Amino acid sequence: VGVHGPLDNGLLTGLLNPTIALALGAVFLVLWLYQRHCPYLAVLAASYWLSAAGFLLQYFTLPIGMAPTKLLSVTCFTIAASGLAGAIVTRYGRRVPFVAIGFLASSGLAAFCWFMFIQPDLTWRILAMNFAFGGLSLVVAAELRVVRDRGPTEMMLFVLSLLSGLNFVARTLVIVIAHGPYQSYDGFYASSYWTTALLSHALLSLLIALSLFCAAALDVMKTLKAEAYTDPLSGLLNRRGFEDAPRISCGTAPPPNFRSRWCSPTSITSRQSTICTGMRRVIA
């Protein structure tokens, strides 16, 4: 394996993103091990690890050659971005837009291959991939816009998706017009485009991960609050639930979704059915 350049400040700055991505991927993996019913956490872990691999392959050239190494790096970035988009959409109960994600990802990779092997042009490769990633970000924003009962984390992810799309499209266009075009990789990793790309990616990836951490923590808290007022066997109110019932009936300190869950006719009928089933099992 050959190093792209000397171990200087530029390389050390470049290693910041893979380090952050590896750490975030490990955290999401641990969360998934404790919440196996949330497969999107495993997808997030894999996405961050693929992102780390993509950044490392930008600085280290494999024995297969520079062009195949760059293609492998961009492939890692594309799969990571697609997985991240799908995981965020899944987290909020939306159907994953496989057609839109697949079209944007495949179009970006196809354009990259064209301007890498058929008509070599580094500037167009940069534009093609950034436009594809910007499109993926806007797809996520469009899906989050129609989520019902949006809370702070949903709004934060929606804003971050818009900022990410703006970062990929507007920032790239401004810098390429101001400092481009780029003819080769000589000096590219010290350019203003690459420096801003590293810093913006590190910031946005951290903010997105923190938002998803908060969302996962809120899910656990809601589950614990619901379980604190119910009996796991019968589904009825437990002692704590009965003790708090007078306060709830007076409208003071109601737990989340208490009335909708326990006072609806459907819920009452369901609990009666559960009690009858349990009694039949005891008699049998």
Q: What is each of the regions a protein language model found here?
A:
Residues 2-22:
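Hydrophobic transmembrane alpha-helical segments in integral membrane proteins
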Residues 40-48, 195-198:
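Juxtamembrane helix-loop boundaries in multi-pass membrane proteins
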Residues 22-40, 53-188, 195, 211, ...:
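Juxtamembrane segments at transmembrane-helix boundaries
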Residues 226-244, 265-278:
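Conserved nucleotide-binding and Mg2+-coordinating catalytic segments in signaling enzymes
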Residues 195-210:
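Hydrophobic alpha-helical transmembrane segments
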Residues 245, 282-284:
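Active-site-proximal alpha-helical element of nucleotidyl cyclase-like catalytic domains
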Residues 224-226, 239-259:
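Short regulatory alpha-helical coupling segments
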